[in-house]
Amino acid sequence: MEWEPVIGLEVHVQLRTQSKIFSGAATAYGAEPNTQACAIDLGLPGVLPVLNKEAVKLAVCFGLSVNASIPPYSIFARKNYFYPDLPKGYQISQYNFPIVQNGHLDIENEDGTTKRIGITRAHLEEDAGKSFHEGMQGYSGIDFNRAGTPLLEIVSEPDIRSAQEAVAYLKALHSLVRYIGVSDANMQEGAFRCDVNISLRPKSEEKFGTRAEIKNVNSFRFVERAILFEINRQKEILENGGTIVQETRLYDAVQDETRSMRTKEEAHDYRYFPDPDLLPVEIGPEFIEAVKNQLPELPWEKRKRFAASYQLSNYDVKLLTTQIEIANYFETVLKIDKTIPPKLAANWINGDLAAALNKNNLSITQSPINAEQLAGLLHRIADNTLSGSMGKQVFETMWGGEGDADTIIERHGLKQITDTEALEKIIDEVIENNPTQVEQYRSGKDKLIAFFVGQVMKATKGKANPQQVNELFKKKL
């Protein structure tokens, strides 16, 4: 029997606010344990939560960017469960009246086709603290710095049918929340975490199978591997006549497997009820319009503009716009020097710069070569001061911190030879020294032109303009 996976994702996005969702405590990552937790975060008696307006604004911003509806009011509820890092014994979340409802996000599959993934809802909630077990013998520690940090939980429809589609959706979502400034979405810091709900059903059936949930998967690669493992696990059980247990599972990256954690809770297990300490949030049309007017250019809008304005291929556009920082870097280069061809800038940013960043595990914001410096280098390539190979030489020297392109060109004598008279003298020598090859070329062996150009490049130590040399040879021969 052929089985079809049915996958839905719940993504927890940490909102980019200076303070927590219900208190004034800071949200900075990496502070000493328990130095950013106040009485409200710790659930101490005699204190009341106060909603952070910026968190509401960011949630609405996300909702508008995925064409969702923003209801006129939203209610916070208490989600009751016990866990050591949940100091109040409940989490303030949303249940029946979430702040974002019924949106969608389009993804591009590997074959270039587009698929629309529905977004059921996105709701605001507070994060829990963090338990520590390593380095502590016989006991565990709890850091409450994260408790109360604002989260937006984004719940997709079960529209995803493969591990590849799941990763494409997550990457599109990750890119979007960074573009609109809702979150830094730093996965290493836990600011973008994913729960995967997955079930199998016979290919021809509409009814869903029993689902398992895989909790807190924090990388695109692990999401893909966890889904592939879970599909095979469920398939093996079903084909051997067994039944799938509705449960919560954990993904073990070392063993590359999912393991049972606990039976899956239903909503009634959490005994949701409206939080009596928080009034319903009223969201008027004026507020929504104000947020809408502040929305930046969205990823798909930027892709269309890049393709139209800069005449770039889909491949180049996709690489340049995946991250907002790369797109900004590219446009900064072109604004600094309008003589630089967009294709030249795209080739260098997607090629040499991207390779150097990957090799050194750096983001583009950490690049030793800023946009102004790269613009200086590309200007010298565009005006034929440097050949492409010489440009690579200068790039490597710039990466090492030896100054801008002009300084390096002057210091190392790397200026390209473009003087026609000087080049013709060298060409005449090459022709004179290679009579056999000249005769063969004139007999129709056109590919020998590369040999002649190579001889000139060798004589000039790579400083000649190969295109110019090519044209001069053709005229001479």
Swiss-Prot record:
EC numbers for this chain: 6.3.5.-
SUPFAM superfamilies in the cross-refs: GatB/YqeY motif (SSF89095), Glutamine synthetase/guanido kinase (SSF55931)
Gene Ontology BP term (one): glutaminyl-tRNAGln biosynthesis via transamidation
This protein's UniProt keywords: ATP-binding, Ligase, Nucleotide-binding, Protein biosynthesis
A single GO molecular function term of this UniProt record: asparaginyl-tRNA synthase (glutamine-hydrolyzing) activity
Reaction catalyzed: L-glutamyl-tRNA(Gln) + L-glutamine + ATP + H2O = L-glutaminyl-tRNA(Gln) + L-glutamate + ADP + phosphate + H(+); L-aspartyl-tRNA(Asn) + L-glutamine + ATP + H2O = L-asparaginyl-tRNA(Asn) + L-glutamate + ADP + phosphate + 2 H(+)
Matching HAMAP family: GatB
Function text: Allows the formation of correctly charged Asn-tRNA(Asn) or Gln-tRNA(Gln) through the transamidation of misacylated Asp-tRNA(Asn) or Glu-tRNA(Gln) in organisms which lack either or both of asparaginyl-tRNA or glutaminyl-tRNA synthetases. The reaction takes place in the presence of glutamine and ATP through an activated phospho-Asp-tRNA(Asn) or phospho-Glu-tRNA(Gln).
Family: Belongs to the GatB/GatE family. GatB subfamily.
Quaternary structure, from the entry: Heterotrimer of A, B and C subunits.
NCBIfam families reported for this sequence: gatB, PRK05477.1-2, PRK05477.1-4, PRK05477.1-5
Protein name: Aspartyl/glutamyl-tRNA(Asn/Gln) amidotransferase subunit B
Species of the source: Coxiella burnetii (strain RSA 493 / Nine Mile phase I)
Lineage per the UniProt record: Bacteria, Pseudomonadati, Pseudomonadota, Gammaproteobacteria, Legionellales
Gene designation per UniProt: gatB
